[in-house]
């Protein structure tokens, strides 16, 4: 019978990789909690229309990357390619806007996109997302960026660059779109890549986001969106920058930063690193006023960001896994019940450890204890079983002593195990 293997672009995460993800989520909860965020869990499956209406039908995500299929009643469903749309749907459906003027929500979990798998980018990937719904003020944008940078710092990441731009609003962006379209019509379109030629007709702003060197060279002199911001958008953006300056947060004004999803407006930002190759973006987000009403909800403004967990994991400094406090080495099959009960007593007092069940020589039992990484090995054989004792061996110094089984927990705790 043939062996069943995982799907291309999907990964199994064992320690230490899974430990890194757990640590990342733990730091996220600690940092976001200080800013008043609460956790929301949304379904992996959503109706396809949700993403078509939010992300945009002309985006690469909707056109080429979504895992979409009909269910048994021929309803089109999609495995979420990003989290914000699902959060907006949950926000509208729950009527949360009637319960509180501001909602601060964070989510984490797997997303799915049919892309070419590469370093830091899988077809199933994981994100941490934060959304602030309610405030229209630029202070919400700035606070979110400050929180993101604090989160990345507390993960121990260095060598990051915050890039920021303003995409304007529904009043001024059409003027920029026309100016950009006129510019693109004046250059040699045949020299652009196939995707950019398509984007010229459907979403000209996305041409600026192209990573193909030839396209970037051809559009180097394109008009910038900042030059076309209306006074209100410019005032909003200046306020965001002023707050970042006051906190001495370095940033780069990147007038080509447009992001890949259609719902963004005004402030948009991205955190990049040159240490993980071509997939240098580790986090990004922006303001999306109008998205909630576009999905059938009230006219509530919002701003948010997403962090790619696989990409963050590539940069995180290694953390030594906590050592187990004990390992019970069973030398006599008759002592297995007592070994299990001893381990349970120790765990009830907050100590972590394992039991080496099964028969074997003392040499093989000690080898198993060494592999466990435990600080102390508790040796339990026939003599110890009869006497109600256990041999406690310090796995670092090699020193050992025989004590009563009811004294083991105090002994391990006193030793700082």
Swiss-Prot record:
Its main location: cytoplasm. InterPro entries: aa-tRNA-synth_II, aa-tRNA-synth_II/BPL/LPL, Anticodon-bd, Anticodon-bd_dom_sf, His-tRNA-ligase, HisRS-like_core, HisRS/HisZ, HisRS_anticodon. It comes from the Bacteria. It catalyses: tRNA(His) + L-histidine + ATP = L-histidyl-tRNA(His) + AMP + diphosphate + H(+). Keywords: Aminoacyl-tRNA synthetase, ATP-binding, Cytoplasm, Ligase, Nucleotide-binding, Protein biosynthesis. One of its GO terms (biological process) is histidyl-tRNA aminoacylation. One of its GO terms (molecular function) is ATP binding. NCBIfam families: hisS. Belongs to the class-II aminoacyl-tRNA synthetase family. Homodimer. HAMAP family: His_tRNA_synth (MF_00127). This is Histidine--tRNA ligase.
């Amino acid at each position: 019978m043939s062996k069943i293997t995982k799907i291309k672009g999907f990964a199994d995460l064992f320690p230490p990789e899974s430990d890194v993800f757990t640590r990342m989520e733990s730091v996220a909860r600690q940092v976001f909690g200080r800013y008043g965020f609460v956790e929301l869990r949304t379904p992996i499956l959503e109706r396809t229309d949700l993403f078509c209406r939010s992300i945009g039908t002309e985006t690469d995500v909707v056109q080429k990357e979504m895992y979409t299929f009909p269910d048994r009643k021929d309803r089109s469903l999609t495995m979420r390619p990003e989290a914000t749309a699902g959060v907006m749907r949950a926000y509208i459906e729950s009527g949360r806007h009637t319960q509180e003027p501001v909602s601060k929500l964070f989510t984490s979990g797997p997303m799915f996109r049919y892309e070419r798998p590469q370093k830091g980018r899988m077809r199933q990937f994981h994100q941490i997302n934060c959304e602030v719904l309610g405030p229209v003020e630029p202070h919400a944008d700035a606070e979110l960026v400050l929180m993101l940078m604090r989160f990345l710092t507390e993960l121990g990441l260095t060598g990051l660059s915050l890039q920021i731009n303003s995409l304007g609003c529904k009043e001024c962006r059409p003027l920029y779109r026309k100016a950009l379209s006129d510019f693109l019509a004046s250059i040699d379109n045949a020299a652009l890549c196939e995707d950019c030629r398509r984007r010229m007709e459907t979403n000209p702003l996305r041409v600026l986001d192209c990573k193909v060197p030839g396209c970037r060279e051809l559009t180097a002199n394109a008009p910038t969106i900042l030059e076309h911001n209306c006074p209100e958008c410019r005032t909003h953006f200046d306020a965001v920058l002023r707050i970042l300056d006051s906190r001495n947060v370095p940033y780069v004004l990147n007038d080509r930063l447009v992001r890949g999803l259609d719902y963004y407006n005004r402030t948009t930002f991205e955190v990049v690193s040159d240490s993980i190759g071509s997939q240098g973006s580790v986090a990004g987000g922006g303001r999306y006023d109008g998205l909630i009403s576009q999905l059938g909800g009230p006219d509530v403004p919002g701003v948010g960001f997403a962090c790619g967990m696989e990409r963050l994991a590539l940069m995180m400094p290694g953390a030594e896994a906590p050592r187990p406090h004990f390992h019970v080495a069973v030398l006599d099959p008759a002592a297995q019940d007592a070994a299990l009960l001893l381990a349970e007593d120790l765990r009830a007092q907050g100590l972590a450890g394992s039991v080496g069940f099964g028969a074997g020589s003392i040499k093989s039992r000690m080898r198993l204890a060494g592999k466990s990484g435990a600080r102390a090995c508790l040796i339990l054989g026939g003599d110890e079983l009869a006497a109600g004792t256990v041999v406690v061996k310090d796995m670092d110094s090699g020193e050992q002593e025989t004590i009563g089984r009811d004294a083991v927990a105090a002994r391990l705790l006193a030793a700082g195990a």
